[in-house]
């Protein structure tokens, strides 16, 4: 069986990993094995946290809506229930933004929900 030296392709593969590890501290940006471990871990965290970010933002929106709803004499769950009965389809992202930037507008939505409970 002939000997395979794996010159170009192996170097190309290693350089790809080292390029991804650029900016890491110490050996993690210089040595292929350390860089591979660091890059694999970083990509796993990135994949996981793209999903966690969605959960975190939804929790933030709910906390903001709840705070604004309580100022208007409702709990979060009562507000959402009232809006469902009134057939108002405003998503939580928009409602949270409204609660922060336009409290009067949010108060109108809250009064609409209150009327339909």
UniProtKB/Swiss-Prot annotation:
The gene is rplT. The keyword rRNA-binding applies. This is Large ribosomal subunit protein bL20. GO terms for molecular function: rRNA binding; structural constituent of ribosome. It comes from the Bacteria. Binds directly to 23S ribosomal RNA and is necessary for the in vitro assembly process of the 50S ribosomal subunit. It is not involved in the protein synthesizing functions of that subunit. One of its GO terms (biological process) is ribosomal large subunit assembly. Belongs to the bacterial ribosomal protein bL20 family. It comes from Geotalea uraniireducens (strain Rf4) (Geobacter uraniireducens). It holds the Pfam family Ribosomal_L20. Keywords: Ribonucleoprotein, Ribosomal protein, RNA-binding, rRNA-binding. GO terms for cellular component: ribonucleoprotein complex; ribosome. Transmembrane segments: none annotated. InterPro entries: Ribosomal_bL20, RIBOSOMAL_L20_CS, Ribosomal_protein_bL20_C. The keyword Transcription regulation does not apply.
């Amino acid at each position: 069986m002939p000997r395979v030296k794996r010159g170009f392709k192996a170097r190309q593969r290693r350089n790809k990993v080292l390029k991804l590890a650029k900016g890491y501290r110490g050996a993690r940006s210089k040595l292929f094995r350390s860089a591979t471990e660091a890059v694999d871990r970083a990509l796993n965290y990135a994949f996981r946290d793209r999903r966690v970010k969605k959960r975190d933002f939804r929790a933030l929106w709910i906390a903001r809506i709840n705070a604004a709803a309580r100022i208007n004499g409702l709990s979060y769950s009562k507000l959402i229930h009232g809006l469902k009965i009134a057939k108002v389809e405003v998503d939580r992202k928009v409602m949270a933004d409204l609660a922060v930037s336009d409290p009067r507008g949010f108060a109108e939505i809250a009064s609409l929900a209150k009327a339909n409970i």
